[in-house]
Each structure stands twice: as C-alpha cells, then as structure tokens.
C-alpha cells in the first residue's frame, strides 16, 4: 500500500512541475523571421500571435504574393520554434512518470 501512495505523491509532484513548465512556456515569446528578415512575427508559447512586423522594402502593392509568402515563412518559423520548445520541455517528463 505504501508503494501506491508514494507513486501517487510522485505523480502529483510531477503534474505540478509540468503545469509550471507549461505556464512558463505559455509566457515565453518566439520570433519567426522570413528571408532577409523582411517579415518578423512573434507568438507566445501557447501559439497566440503577438505581432507582425514588415520592413518597408517588402511592402509593394504590385507584388502582394511575396509579402504573403514571407509572412507565411515567418509564421511557420515561429510556430516551429514553439513546437520544438514544447517537445523539449514536455519530453523531459516522459521518463519520470512512476508508472
């Protein structure tokens, strides 16, 4: 019976640690950039968009497709960083579960 109680306590402790890491991740910011850094976007760790910034050189009414492509590049870059950080932080808990 004691083993089960210890396992439950350890699981609860790990859950609290994981919740704190998730909160830390959500409070973090990740900035993605396009080629030549003409477009930058910033997301929180819980994938909320904070900002999109465009350099003047990329804003051309005659070539809206380039602006769209660079925006997509920057967004995908930032979200990839969020995913990598999430895997790294949450993956650390996988081997610590007592069951």
From Swiss-Prot:
Similarity section: Belongs to the YbaB/EbfC family.
Pfam families (alphabetical): YbaB_DNA_bd (PF02575)
Quaternary structure, from the entry: Homodimer.
GO CC annotation: bacterial nucleoid; cytosol
Keyword rRNA-binding listed: no
InterPro entries on file: YbaB-like_sf (IPR036894), YbaB/EbfC (IPR004401)
Feature: compositional bias, Low complexity: 1-10
Molecular function via GO: DNA binding
UniProt subcellular location: Cytoplasm, Nucleoid
Residues covered by region (Disordered): 1-20
Protein name as annotated: Nucleoid-associated protein SAG1747
Keyword flag DNA-binding: yes
């Amino acid at each position: 019976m004691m083993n089960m109680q210890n396992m439950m306590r350890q699981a609860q402790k790990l859950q609290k640690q994981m919740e704190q890491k998730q909160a830390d991740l959500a409070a973090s910011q990740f900035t993605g950039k396009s080629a030549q850094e003409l477009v930058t976007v910033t997301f929180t760790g819980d994938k909320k968009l904070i900002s999109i910034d465009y350099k003047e050189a990329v804003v051309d009414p005659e070539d809206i497709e380039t602006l769209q492509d660079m925006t997509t590049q920057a967004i995908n870059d930032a979200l990839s960083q969020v995913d990598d950080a999430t895997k790294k932080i949450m993956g650390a808990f996988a081997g610590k579960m007592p069951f």
